Amino acid sequence: MTYKEYRDKVLNFIEEHEKWRSHTINLIASENITSPSVNRAVASGFMHKYAEGWPKQRYYQGCKYVDEVELIGVELFTKLFKSDYADLRPISGTNANQAVFFGLGQPGDKVIVLHTSHGGHISHMPFGAAGMRGLEVHTWPFDFESFNIDVDKAEKMIRELEPKIVMFGGSLFPFPHPVKELAPVAKEVGAFVVYDAAHVLGLIAGGEFQDPLREGADIMTASTHKTFPGPQGGVILYKKFADDETIAKLQWAIFPGVVSNHHLHHMAGKVITAAEMLEYGEAYAKQIVKNAKALAEALAEEGFKVIGEDQGYTKSHQVIVDVSDLHPAGGGWAAPLLEEAGIILNKNLLPWDPLEKVNEPSGLRIGVQEMTRVGMMEDEMREIAHFIKRVLIDKEDPKKVRKDVYYFRLEYQKVYYSFDYGLPMKE
């Protein structure tokens, strides 16, 4: 094969992927779809540019237009999240967490985070960014019944350990975390309160879920491509939470600590997404939560064991389903079958699963944010629940269901809650 043929093959795979993706029901909770305007930014000449440092204080020349875009971004993000500072330079949510761990922690300092099985992100773990910084990682006590941090036991843990950082947020995140209840206790022992908003940033922007910076968090870290429907990237939002020297340590941890050039085409895409969310974020976040509740209720009616029934199943974009009663391999069996039917989601550990079950966990994690953005509403969620039932409970041939999924998805090809297409119209 010639090198040009390799090129052609790659371009063909990209084209095939885009065609395939546009005809699937994508329920991956950590993905979304960007608007045409954001796509223009990401594909722009900003991808060729390098910039280090702050706007107007660069180490490279030729940043005149890049600086203006980034300054607009700081203005829009601080307005959207009512923060004192917004730093768009992290290139991922994990990268944002790295900056916090390196800026505010020293090797041997204690941090309290959510355990992976309970929904914590890998970057919070001893084998992730927290451990790589040399932090001593402790995990929140968890209440299986409420599917959340156990507040009483957590208060006791904070007072006993006197950690440097307490961290809320995670990857399995159907219900708000008790920031309001635990932040005052953390402040008593001098801990920084950090909230990883990667999954719920768009819901926070739209006034749904919870408002961490008003509830006591000092800092929010996040990725920008889940419920916040931008390009892949990260952001750090924070209040004037400490003296100037401490804040400077965080800023220096970002650059030159863990970021050099900050992928300016993605930065520009984040800025446009912030403008979209200021215009449409409230409607978008509201519909996401409505859709998640509708899907959860429909799945329960179809015979699935949906987690969190006593609390209304979910208050976020996520629906968590325990499928271990359908097959010994649980989510490891269900997710590939659903992919054959054109329904894309991921297997997931549930709080009672040991880490050894990572490939055959009990659960499925479902997110509705992308299908909401292409215009789907509660009625469509009920149809999706029935597609899932046909595959997993009725044991129908996934290829047969795939045909129905294909035609169902054909109607939903526009990216709403954007300046390109506005709001979806309910017929």
UniProtKB/Swiss-Prot annotation:
Q: Where on the chain is N6-(pyridoxal phosphate)lysine found, per UniProt?
A: 226
- What are the protein's GO molecular function terms? glycine hydroxymethyltransferase activity; pyridoxal phosphate binding
Q: Which GO terms of the cellular component aspect does the record hold? A: cytoplasm
Q: Give the pathway annotation.
A: Amino-acid biosynthesis; glycine biosynthesis; glycine from L-serine: step 1/1
GO biological processes: glycine biosynthetic process from serine; tetrahydrofolate interconversion
Q: Does the keyword Transmembrane helix apply?
A: no
Q: What does this protein do?
A: Catalyzes the reversible interconversion of serine and glycine with a modified folate serving as the one-carbon carrier. Also exhibits a pteridine-independent aldolase activity toward beta-hydroxyamino acids, producing glycine and aldehydes, via a retro-aldol mechanism.
Q: Which HAMAP family match?
A: SHMT (MF_00051)
Quote the protein name from its UniProt record: Serine hydroxymethyltransferase
The species is Pyrococcus furiosus (strain ATCC 43587 / DSM 3638 / JCM 8422 / Vc1)
Designated gene of the protein? glyA
